[in-house]
């Protein structure tokens, strides 16, 4: 039937008229009825028509579509005999084994067909073979090959003369040749191959010009089991079939179109009903015994007819299919009463190569050769352990040999290193001086020591000097002591501070702030730049300094290791590093440390005199005293008073030889004026800012300030 509606009628009808709507309805209805399967109609911009016609009703399920306006004839050629089909295939010189067709190219479908009783035969079953092509192909051909038969009733398994062509046995074959004008999908179907119960067939569909093949192995149960009378009787109502629910067995086939799995397909009578169909899988033993091993159960939910059987190894298998109807069981014990055994279909299957994923194959290999793999793993582990022990022993032996080697390293460069320490007391400073002395004399170092740089040079500003040294030097030695531990304690430093005992403030705190800030920015470089040293009497490294994990040395025992660090000499911790430092120098250094330890014993509370609260160290307020009236009558009296009270001498005394007349005049006017002398201000952290404001406090006796060294004298008029 042609699915084409002409437009001549539309030219005379207005849009939306009832006749126009009726016309489109009739066209669409005829289009649906024109195809055996509407789902295969090509939804394109033009109308197609099925041009497949054959006098043999065995091809009735086939269809070939071309465009409706295609007037050319012969869009296809059928090969209706085995001879024609075989000759077409032989022209392409095909090998015995062809590759499997790619997915999506064709579909191979099998189903049983019931043929009712006639005047010349009893009821029997045919096999319907359908190949649907979804892409452009040239030729579709399929053969039916009998693999085995239960008896001689199967005509295809016999050696009758009808099976031979020119003396060569040819299996039944049917095919079709398609022109380039054919539209897809296209189906070629043949339903007249006789199906014999319990026979096993192989159906091979060959596609040209792709030269590929799809193979299926199938079998059928007993005829009456597959087609119960109630299912094939046309007079029986479907409701009666549903109510009766007769027992039946399915047709069973194995599709090899998937390279990594097998599709198990089940066929049934057209009106047979079910909920599920079950396939039991058994593995046959390789020793040709009758024993089988149960593997798994495959379940197909109706109306589906296929299930994917994945991960199989090469070997022989037995597939048993049945339909659990009305509580029937696959197997009934002999003593079990009221048990009904389901009707079953058996298929012996041979898989010549593995059809499974790589992961599953690897797991199966492990299971099959588990003991051998275990032995191999144990041997490998033993070998690794032996190699590890051998390597470890070699490393120990090498280190032992190297430890016996003596490396003489000449310290040719002078390293400039800064000593960062806290001013605990004079005895501690003596130990630091010994460190400086030994660094200079025995370690080829140029120590930067504040007592040498700041006290001898009055023009240097301590804070600026500290910043210059930290920004320019590459090596620093941090000396840990009791006062240093207090200064590094953040909470203690908020309320207490170190009593100043030198002309300049203690620089340990500011120096450590800059060092810690620099070290936290780059830990690897800090470990090469900063070193922490402790004397025998020193406390442990404070936690906030120990967290930096800087190299730490105990002096004088590890003075050689400290020297190696300062000169960047690489060595292991177990290396024995020695240095040309005399025993006498070590002895003197130990004596300094011993004096410090003895001082701790004699003065257990010495730290309280050096570490005091900040409010006690505030600037001492100067209190006004009774003025001391010094009568000055002459210039000589003024000079004498200046010398006695550390005043700057009068200008007349300095320049008396050159400027007597000029300088004596301003002083002459004050000869008879008395002067008031105030005691000097005491040094304190806030003395500069508070001295003048606090000078008005109430007076105290002169005895309060006896013994103090006057540093500043303020001269005021009375």
Swiss-Prot record:
GO terms for cellular component: plasma membrane; plasma membrane protein complex; receptor complex. Residues 36-372 are extracellular. Keywords: Cell membrane, Glycoprotein, Membrane, Receptor, Signal, Transmembrane, Transmembrane helix. Residues 414-564 form the SEFIR domain. GO terms for molecular function: interleukin-17 receptor activity. It is a single-pass type I membrane protein. GO terms for biological process: interleukin-17-mediated signaling pathway; positive regulation of locomotion; sensory processing. It holds the Pfam family SEFIR. PROSITE patterns: SEFIR. Residues 687-707 have a biased composition (Acidic residues). Residues 654-718 are annotated as: Disordered. It is found in: Cell membrane. Glycans are attached at residues 42, 128, 204, 237. Expressed in most neurons, and in pharyngeal muscle. Residues 1-30 form the signal peptide. Residues 394-718 are cytoplasmic. The chain crosses the membrane at residues 373-393. InterPro entries: IL-17_rcpt-like, SEFIR_dom. Component of a heterodimeric receptor complex composed of ilcr-1 and ilcr-2. The receptor complex interacts with actl-1 and ilc-17.1 with the interaction being mediated by ilcr-2. Forms a receptor complex together with receptor ilcr-1, which upon activation acts as a modulator of neuronal activity. Binding of the ligand ilc-17.1 to the ilcr-1/2 receptor complex triggers a signaling cascade that activates the downstream signaling components actl-1, pik-1 and nfki-1, and results in increased neuronal activity in RMG interneurons in response to input from oxygen-sensing neurons. This leads to increased animal movement and promotes aggregation behavior. This is Interleukin cytokine receptor-related protein 2. It comes from Caenorhabditis elegans.
């Amino acid at each position: 039937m042609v699915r084409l509606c002409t437009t001549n009628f539309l030219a005379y009808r207005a849009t939306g008229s009832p006749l126009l709507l009726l016309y489109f309805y009739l066209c669409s209805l005829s289009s649906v009825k024109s195809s055996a399967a509407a789902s295969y109609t090509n939804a394109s911009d033009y109308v197609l028509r099925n041009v497949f016609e054959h006098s043999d009703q065995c091809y009735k399920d086939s269809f070939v579509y071309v465009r409706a306006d295609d007037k050319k004839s012969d869009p296809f050629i059928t090969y209706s005999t085995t001879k024609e089909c075989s000759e077409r295939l032989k022209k392409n010189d095909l090998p015995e084994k062809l590759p499997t067709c790619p997915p999506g190219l064709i579909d191979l479908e099998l189903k049983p067909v019931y043929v009712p009783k006639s005047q010349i035969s009893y009821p029997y079953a045919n096999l319907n073979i359908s190949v649907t092509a979804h892409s452009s192909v040239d030729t579709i051909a399929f053969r039916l090959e009998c693999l085995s038969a239960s008896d001689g009733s199967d005509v295809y398994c016999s050696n009758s003369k009808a099976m031979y062509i020119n003396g060569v046995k040819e299996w039944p074959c049917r095919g079709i040749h398609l022109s380039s004008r054919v539209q897809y999908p296209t189906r070629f179907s043949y339903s007249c191959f006789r199906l014999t119960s319990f026979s096993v067939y192989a159906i091979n569909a060959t596609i040209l010009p792709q030269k590929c093949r799809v193979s299926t192995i199938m079998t059928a149960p007993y005829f009456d089991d597959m087609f119960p009378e109630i299912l094939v009787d046309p007079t029986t109502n479907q409701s009666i079939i549903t109510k009766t629910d007769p027992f039946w067995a399915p047709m069973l086939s194995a599709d090899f179109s998937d390279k990594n799995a097998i599709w198990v397909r089940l066929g049934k009578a057209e009106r047979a009903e079910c909920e599920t169909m079950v396939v039991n899988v058994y593995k046959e033993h390789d020793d040709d015994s009758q024993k089988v091993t149960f593997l798994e159960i495959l379940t197909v939910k109706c109306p589906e007819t296929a299930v994917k059987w994945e991960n199989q190894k090469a070997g022989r298998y037995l597939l048993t299919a049945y339909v659990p109807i009305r509580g029937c069981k696959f197997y009934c014990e002999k003593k079990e009463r009221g048990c009904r055994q389901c009707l079953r279909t058996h298929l012996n299957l041979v898989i010549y190569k593995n059809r499974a994923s790589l992961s599953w194959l690897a797991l199966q290999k492990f299971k099959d050769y588990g003991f051998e793999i275990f032995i191999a793993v144990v041997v490998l582990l033993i070998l690794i352990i032996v190699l590890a022990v051998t390597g470890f022993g070699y490393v120990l032996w090498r280190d032992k040999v190297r430890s016996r080697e003596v490396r003489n390293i000449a310290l040719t460069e002078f390293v400039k290193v800064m000593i960062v320490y806290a001013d605990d007391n004079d005895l501690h400073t003596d130990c630091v001086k010994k460190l400086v002395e030994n660094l200079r004399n025995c370690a080829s170092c140029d120590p930067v020591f504040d007592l040498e740089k700041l006290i001898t040079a009055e023009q240097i500003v301590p804070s600026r000097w500290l910043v210059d040294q930290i920004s320019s030097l590459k090596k620093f030695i941090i000396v840990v002591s009791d006062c240093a531990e207090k200064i590094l304690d953040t909470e203690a430093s908020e309320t207490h501070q170190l009593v100043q005992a030198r002309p300049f403030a203690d620089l340990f705190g500011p120096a450590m702030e800059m060092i810690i800030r620099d070290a936290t920015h780059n830990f690897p470089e800090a470990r090469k730049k900063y070193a922490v040293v402790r004397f025998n009497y020193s406390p442990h490294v404070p936690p906030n300094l120990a967290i930096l994990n800087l190299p730490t040395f105990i002096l004088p025992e590890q003075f050689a290791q400290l020297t190696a660090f300062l000169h960047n000499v690489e060595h292991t911790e177990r290396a024995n590093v020695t240095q040309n430092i005399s025993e006498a120098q070590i002895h003197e250094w130990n004596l300094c440390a011993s004096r410090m330890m003895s001082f701790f014993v004699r003065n257990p509370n010495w730290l309280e005199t050096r570490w005091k609260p900040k409010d006690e160290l505030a600037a001492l307020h100067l209190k006004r005293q009774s003025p001391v009236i010094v009568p000055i009558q002459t210039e000589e009296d003024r000079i004498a008073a200046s010398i006695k009270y550390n005043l700057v001498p009068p200008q007349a005394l300095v320049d008396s030889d050159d400027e007597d007349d000029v300088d004596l005049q301003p002083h002459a006017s004050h000869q008879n004026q008395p002067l008031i002398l105030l005691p000097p201000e005491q040094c304190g952290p806030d003395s500069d800012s508070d001295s003048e404001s606090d000078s008005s406090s109430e007076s105290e006796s002169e005895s309060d300030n006896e013994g103090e060294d006057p540093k500043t004298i303020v001269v005021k008029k009375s």
